Amino acid sequence: MSFLELAKKRYSVRNYKDRPVEKEKILQVLEAARNAPSACNYQPWHFIVIADDEEIKNKVAETYPRNWFRKAPVVIAACGDHSLSWKRADGKDHCDVDIAIAVDHMTLAAAELGLGTCWVCAFDAEKCHKVLN
């Protein structure tokens, strides 16, 4: 499939099948993020895959209280480290831009693999940080 076809195929999914995602597919999605461009190639991110630990999954779900989110078989938390990100001369920090590019690479890779994704930004970041730390 062409890139344009892939971009058209990807959409926000909020209804998931009740089955686990194969580890190989998760690794391919993460590899797409690793290959994403970032300012000066600093890659100021790390990703936490939440799939098998029901206790952590439930605590993370409390940071974004939507029923569909609780039903996702996998959640990948994209974490930025602003101390590692490139800063422009005027102080503009590119961490969030770099992470957005990496996450978009993941969503496109997932779509190519037949997996549905949905960006979630309106979660309680402080609470999520405490759960995942």
Regions found by a protein language model. Name each.
Residues 1-74, 79:
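N-terminal amphipathic, basic helical "cap/leader" segment at the start of enzyme domains
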Residues 33-34, 76, 90-131:
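Small-aliphatic-rich amphipathic alpha-helix that forms the alpha element of a beta-alpha
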Residues 55, 71, 82-84, 102-108:
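Domain-scale selection of a single, long terminal region
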Residues 57-58, 83-94:
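Glycine/charged-rich beta-loop-alpha catalytic/anionic-binding loops adjacent to active sites
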Residues 62-65, 91-92, 133:
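Short, glycine/charged-enriched secondary-structure capping and boundary segments
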Residues 65-66, 82-83, 111:
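Short, intrinsically disordered/low-complexity patches at protein termini
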